[in-house]
Amino acid sequence: MPTAETLERFIARVEANAHAEAVEEFYTEDASMQENQSTPRIGRDAHVANERTVLSKVKTLTSQCIRPIFVSGDRVVVRWIFRFEWLNGTVTHMEELAYQLWEGERIAEETFFYDPAQRVPKKLDPQ
């Protein structure tokens, strides 16, 4: 079960948009990560590579944890809101729940639940 301090450090890393670093620091070596009902990705190195690939296409990113965080033993649920402004001038706004299984101070399994329609980038509104 993660300590409250560990959860706060994890959330702070994600909110600082250090997504790849958060995976390196807070996931087990053989962690699984799954998007809705898709096939899970396995392995911390694969997750880090995926995060870096996504972030290489981002102009700006806002990551926000919406509290409260739900903790029940080794199970944690975090509500996130992300806003991606892509290099191609489009924007993606996503809200998701991350359902996590922690082994001590690291995440061993994580499933993201969200409406897949949110992943479709939209043209940035001129202001």
Q: Model segments located where?
A:
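Short, cysteine-centered beta-strand-loop-beta hairpins and adjacent loop/turn segments enriched
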Residues: 56-60, 84-91
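A solvent-exposed, acidic/Ser-Thr-rich amphipathic alpha-helical stretch
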Residues: 2-6, 20-74
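A short hydrophobic beta-strand element
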Residues: 73-82
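Low-complexity, intrinsically disordered terminal/linker segments enriched in charged
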Residues: 111-127
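Short, surface-exposed coil-to-beta transition loops
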Residues: 62-65, 79, 92-98
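Short beta-strand segments enriched in hydrophobic/aromatic residues
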Residues: 27, 82-84, 98, 114
